[in-house]
Each structure stands twice: as structure tokens, then as C-alpha cells.
Design a protein with these regions (language model features):
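Bacterial N-terminal signal peptides that target proteins for export
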Residues: 1-8
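Short, linear, compositionally biased motifs with a strong N-terminal bias
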Residues: 10-13
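N-terminal signal peptide c-region/cleavage motif recognized by signal peptidases
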Residues: 15-17
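Secreted/extracellular ectodomain signature
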Residues: 20-209
Length: 209
């Protein structure tokens, strides 16, 4: 009986520790998209999706923002607060906005979902390393004459969206292939098109407060 109580106490202590750690989470990759490809209901719809996933993970008390740019002048970097940001395991991925865009600690091991799980990367089946951003490497909106946001996140058919590689791995050693937020345009905006180029309609979520 005594050993049983000790085991239960240890289990509860471990659970409490894990919960406390998760309560500090301020960054994650969505574990699922809304299911309509790059049609996220605009950035507001994407923000709401972040909020729903965060609430399910026990951190819904924070204000969550999707790391997405919109044409012509909504910059992802300006939407996400000041940092620092930590993943579900308590690892700091960036100290502030400048750190995030100059020396981020984002890779397959740290770009975890709100559940604390790794996302499939290059070499995994299926590959899901394409993450929607619609952004330049500096986290800014792309030129308005180039629709790289699938109609500002309202299209699920023709079009294109800029994506990054959460695993920092691509076909070669170029800066683009290793970029977490600005690797290449998708071949379309539908769920199937995103899957066809190594994605699944996922995006980054940051706590803005």
C-alpha cells in the first residue's frame, strides 16, 4: 500500500511538473490546420485556430497570434509580441523579434506542436515540413503584385503561399532551403496541393503577451 501511494504521488508530481512547464509555452506549430488548405479565414481565422489549440493545451489564457503576413502591409513579425518564446518543453526558440529573424533556435527538435510533439520533416513519411507564413526572411509581407498568401489566407484552390521549413532542411544547402519562414512558394492553396509539396496546412503560433 505504501509503495502504491508513493507511486501515485510520484505520478502526480510528474504530471504537475509537466503541466507547469506547459503553462510557460508561448510558441508552437499547429498540430492540425482548419482542413481547408490555405483558406484559414484570413489572419483572424488563423489567430482563432491558434487560440483554440492553445486552450486545449492549457494555455488559452494567453493571446495567441498566427505568424502570417498579409498583402500589402501586414507583417508577421509585428503581430506576435516581443518575446521571449518557449516551446512545450520549455526550450527558448527566440529571445525577441530580432533574435527570431537573425538567430532562431527553430528546428525539427524545437518546432513542436502545442502537444509537445515533433512534426514530420524531410525524410519522414509523409513529409510535412512546409509551414505557411506568406513572409520574407525578415518576417515582412511580400510585394503586393505577388500573391504569396493565397489571397490573404482566403483561398483553397488556385494560388500560392510562401512557406518555411520548420526542420531547416531542403533539397540543397541554400539559405532558402534552410529557412524556417521563407523557403519557397507552394504549388497551390488546396489541402492536396499543400501536401503535394511537403506540407499539411500547418502554421506557427506565438503568444503575443
Amino acid at each position: 500500500m505504501r509503495l502504491s501511494r508513493i507511486a501515485v504521488a510520484a505520478s502526480l508530481a510528474f504530471a504537475a511538473s509537466a503541466f507547469a512547464q506547459d503553462k510557460q509555452m508561448s510558441f508552437f506549430v499547429t498540430s492540425a490546420g482548419p482542413g481547408k488548405g490555405a483558406d484559414l479565414g484570413g489572419v483572424k481565422g488563423a489567430d482563432q485556430h491558434c487560440q483554440v489549440l492553445a486552450k486545449a493545451a492549457g494555455v488559452g489564457n494567453r493571446t495567441w497570434r498566427a505568424y502570417l503576413s498579409e498583402s500589402p502591409s501586414t507583417n508577421a513579425r509585428d503581430r506576435i509580441g516581443k518575446g521571449p518564446w518557449t516551446n512545450a518543453k520549455g526550450v527558448v526558440v527566440a529571445k525577441n523579434v530580432e533574435d527570431l529573424h537573425q538567430n532562431p533556435n527553430i528546428n525539427k527538435q524545437t518546432a513542436l506542436t502545442e502537444k509537445g510533439e515533433q512534426v514530420n520533416g524531410r525524410g519522414d513519411t509523409p513529409n510535412m515540413h512546409d509551414v505557411l507564413t506568406g513572409s520574407t526572411p525578415e518576417g515582412r509581407a511580400l510585394p503586393a503584385d505577388k500573391d504569396m498568401t493565397c489571397g490573404n489566407w482566403t483561398k483553397s484552390g488556385d494560388g500560392s503561399a510562401m512557406v518555411g521549413h520548420h526542420d531547416r532542411t531542403g533539397l540543397n544547402e541554400s539559405a532558402e532551403a534552410k529557412s524556417w519562414n521563407s523557403s519557397h512558394p507552394s504549388k497551390g492553396c488546396s489541402q492536396d496541393a499543400l501536401k503535394g509539396t511537403g506540407g499539411n496546412g500547418y502554421f506557427y503560433c506565438f503568444a503575443a503577451n
